[in-house]
Amino acid sequence: MTKRKLHNNWIIVTTMITFVTIFLFCLIIIFFLKDTLHNSELDDAERSSSDINNLFHSKPVKDISALDLNASLGNFQEIIIYDEHNNKLFETSNDNTVRVEPGYEHRYFDRVIKKRYKGIDYLIIKEPITTQDFKGYSLLIHSLENYDNIVKSLYIIALAFGVIATIITATISYVFSTQITKPLVSLSNKMIEIRRDGFQNKLQLNTNYEEIDNLANTFNEMMSQIEESFNQQRQFVEDASHELRTPLQIIQGHLNLIQRWGKKDPAVLEESLNISIEEMNRIIKLVEELLELTKGDVNDISSEAQTVHINDEIRSRIHSLKQLHPDYQFDTDLTSKNLEIKMKPHQFEQLFLIFIDNAIKYDVKNKKIKVKTRLKNKQKIIEITDHGIGIPEEDQDFIFDRFYRVDKSRSRSQGGNGLGLSIAQKIIQLNGGSIKIKSEINKGTTFKIIF
């Protein structure tokens, strides 16, 4: 099916609506004007006919002259006087006036008739005349030539007005539709550019139409979300390719070792299988963390948000950690004030364990970790402090980047992927919080989480 252009369709529709509206309007106006003018012509004819009748009542018939009759007539009028026997007594008509023969026709026709003669319409009014010395009737012939000319002029004016109005409407519609469709054309072209070149540019439309500007803003927001989703997917692929390469190479190497020696040497088989399983577990954990970072539900927090009692959650997690790491000392300094926050419970547990796990990894000597909470200026503050190796100042701006490791020589042996702090930062930001870091080499690190 052939699709029509919105631009052309708009012009056609608006022009047709305008034309039909003007056409109907002109017809109504002409109808009322014709009726008014026709009634005016009829009134003039009847008035003249009445004046003729009054003339015959004012003086004897023998004293009435043609001059008297003409004085009672208006423009474009003639008069014929008949006696009661249909004999013509007076006539002011000429050769160009409609002929009305005496006899049956005008004896019995209605008082007012309309006849056409030589292309001109006439009104003929029959008026009885009865006086003391005369009995007959008059036929007043009123030409409608002037009326017809006025009506014709009205039709011509209406037609000219309709044509001019249609042309003006079509021109205005063309200009207006161009302004309306121009942003849509720009939108279409921008989509083509994005499909071809990517998300480098935004749609810039400066119009006087709120709807068009809202459309452009919505489009830009949609493109930003699509770009973010696209970048997340690309980042996931890049990160996965980068981090999966090493464990996959290790697994491949041990599988080759099993194929070559493991069939005959149980020790080699056992060792290679254990290492392969360990690397597979590392891959699974890595993929889970990558998926956590690339989730797109940034704005969908409130649907599962619950009231989290911070101090209660920390006490519960610390109790479990003491059982899991009996060689570590966990000190707590929790405020007596009730600290609450709206968020998904598993997210709070996840980010808290990320910081504790990070402290355990890098505090292998003193093995002393402190957790402190307080309320300041309506802000809920959580501080997690270790006494480990610390973070160099030049590294502190990058520790939340994906796969960034401060102690690069030890991170793989400690099982880290460099994603934990990135995940924690994302959770904190999604819930309207912020994070600060304070660290000194060989003295320890404090992470301050603020909600």
From Swiss-Prot:
Enzyme class: transferase
Record key words, sorted: ATP-binding, Cell membrane, Kinase, Membrane, Nucleotide-binding, Phosphoprotein, Transferase, Transmembrane, Transmembrane helix, Two-component regulatory system, Virulence
PANTHER family hit by this protein: SENSOR HISTIDINE KINASE ARSS, SENSOR HISTIDINE KINASE CPXA
Coiled coil feature spans: none
Topology within the bilayer: Multi-pass membrane protein
GO molecular function: ATP binding; phosphorelay sensor kinase activity
Primary localisation category: membrane
Domain of life according to the entry: Bacteria
PTM comment, free text: Autophosphorylated.
Cell location: Cell membrane
Domain HAMP: 178-231
Phosphohistidine modification, residue list: H242
Lineage: Bacteria, Bacillati, Bacillota, Bacilli, Bacillales
Keyword Kinase part of the UniProt annotation: yes
GO cellular component: plasma membrane
Reactions accelerated catalytically: ATP + protein L-histidine = ADP + protein N-phospho-L-histidine
EC number: 2.7.13.3
Its job: Member of the two-component regulatory system ArlS/ArlR involved in the regulation of adhesion, autolysis, multidrug resistance and virulence. ArlS probably functions as a sensor protein kinase which is autophosphorylated at a histidine residue and transfers its phosphate group to ArlR.
Transmembrane segments: 11-31, 156-176
Domain Histidine kinase: 239-451
Protein's recorded name: Signal transduction histidine-protein kinase ArlS
